Swiss-Prot record:
<dbReference type="GO" id="GO:0005737">
    <property type="term" value="C:cytoplasm"/>
</dbReference>
<feature type="modified residue" description="Phosphoserine">
    <location>
        <position position="59"/>
    </location>
</feature>
<protein>
    <recommendedName>
        <fullName>Putative cyclin-dependent kinase inhibitor SPL2</fullName>
    </recommendedName>
</protein>
<keyword id="KW-0649">Protein kinase inhibitor</keyword>
<comment type="function">
    <text>Putative cyclin-dependent kinase (CDK) inhibitor necessary and sufficient for PHO pathway-dependent down-regulation of low-affinity phosphate transport.</text>
</comment>
<dbReference type="GO" id="GO:0004860">
    <property type="term" value="F:protein kinase inhibitor activity"/>
</dbReference>
<keyword id="KW-0963">Cytoplasm</keyword>
<keyword id="KW-0597">Phosphoprotein</keyword>
<feature type="modified residue" description="Phosphoserine">
    <location>
        <position position="86"/>
    </location>
</feature>
Length: 148
């Protein structure tokens, strides 16, 4: 059984695990979808010495880590539970139903303008049908007229 030392490094979402045993290297994905590489103690010492003595930049260190043969990218889909389509459909169907109907109503402002134009043309037609007669009935509901 392999045991791990508590040395875990996180460099740009690449975790490096250091084995206490020198045999067997693995690469695996963490639960958050980050790539992890497990290296032996000898490789850890080489990486540590190379970083301290050569003074390499962090980007060079990351590039060398990614070139290691033990480092491989795994599919993160196996670590996440798939979302059911019925769940997403129910959310869109109930929560945002009124908003979606309002937003997706085709040409709502154009329809309102057309309705207003139709009402205005009907009123104009009624006015001209009555031979332009204005009687006192139109002033019954007006509050500006004096009541006698």
């Amino acid at each position: 059984m392999r045991t791990y030392t508590p040395l875990i490094y996180n460099i740009y979402n690449v975790h490096i695990w250091v084995f206490t045993e020198s045999q067997g290297q693995i690469g695996q994905m963490s639960p958050r979808g980050k790539m992890e590489t497990a290296v032996s103690q000898g490789q850890h010492k080489q990486l540590k010495d190379g970083h301290q003595h050569k003074g390499r930049k962090l980007s060079e260190e990351i590039a060398s880590l990614l070139r290691l043969k033990e480092c491989r990218r795994l599919n993160p889909a196996s670590y996440y539970t798939p979302r059911r389509t019925s769940q997403s459909q129910s959310l869109s169907g109930s929560t945002f139903k009124e908003y979606n109907e309002y937003v997706n109503e085709k040409d709502s402002s154009r329809a309102q303008r057309q309705n207003a134009a139709a009402v205005l043309s009907k009123l104009a037609h009624d006015f001209w049908e009555n031979d332009c007669v204005i009687d006192e009935d139109i002033f019954e509901d007006s509050s500006d007229e004096e009541q006698s």
